[in-house]
């Protein structure tokens, strides 16, 4: 599974 | 960052500050659902566990700190400092009906089966229904103080603006997060009848009263 991008939203 | 997300964050921050000031200045949490505030504290705690491990920007980190600190301060004022004014008889929504299903769903539908990601997903699902005890309490008491309706309006508008932010990001950044979008839609839909009452009543200077 693609490395999930870190959540950049509050 | 885009204008919709920025305005959404400002709206969210102002809702939090409106509530803090209302309780602190009036030294009363009448009409406020402690259960919803507890749920919001859980939402921020489970969502911002990466506060120290994942630096996005100064803005991102400082807003997270403010959200977590203010949500705990609000819970403390309701259940400790001004607990004598807490209207527990009308704050009777069964929060376990919100916590358990969202916790189970976060295990079943998520982006990554890792602790941080499952907690983030749980926080997204929980936030979408966290206002229900408050809306339930307003419908039970049949009315809400005007300041409380301003709080609810700002809180509802924040996620509505985030919906536009996700349209923007899909269009210009080819980014979209289906979990956040679906939960955000549910969250916004739950406010619809309140938005209607707020726009037709409160903005005309009347008190917000629900047909009991």
Swiss-Prot record, chain B:
Residue numbers marked as site, Important for recycling of cargo proteins with the sequence motif K-D-E-L from the Golgi to the endoplasmic reticulum: 193
Region (Interaction with the K-D-E-L motif on target proteins): 47-48, 159-169
PROSITE patterns the record matches: ER_LUMEN_RECEPTOR_1 (PS00951), ER_LUMEN_RECEPTOR_2 (PS00952)
Membrane-topology annotation of the record: Multi-pass membrane protein
InterPro entries: ER_ret_rcpt (IPR000133)
Region feature Important for recycling of cargo proteins with the sequence motif K-D-E-L from the Golgi to the endoplasmic reticulum, mapped onto this chain: 204-207
Site (Interaction with the K-D-E-L motif on target proteins): residue numbering on this chain: 5, 117
GO cellular component, one term: endoplasmic reticulum
Stretches assigned to the Lumenal side: 1-4, 53-58, 111-116, 169-178
Main location: Golgi
Residue spans, topological domain Cytoplasmic: 25-32, 80-92, 136-149, 200-212
UniProt keyword list: Cytoplasmic vesicle, Endoplasmic reticulum, ER-Golgi transport, Golgi apparatus, Membrane, Protein transport, Receptor, Transmembrane, Transmembrane helix, Transport
Subcellular location, record wording: Golgi apparatus membrane; Cytoplasmic vesicle, COPI-coated vesicle membrane; Endoplasmic reticulum membrane; Endoplasmic reticulum-Golgi intermediate compartment membrane
Family classification: Belongs to the ERD2 family.
Name of the featured protein: ER lumen protein-retaining receptor 1-B
Species whose genome carries this gene: Xenopus laevis
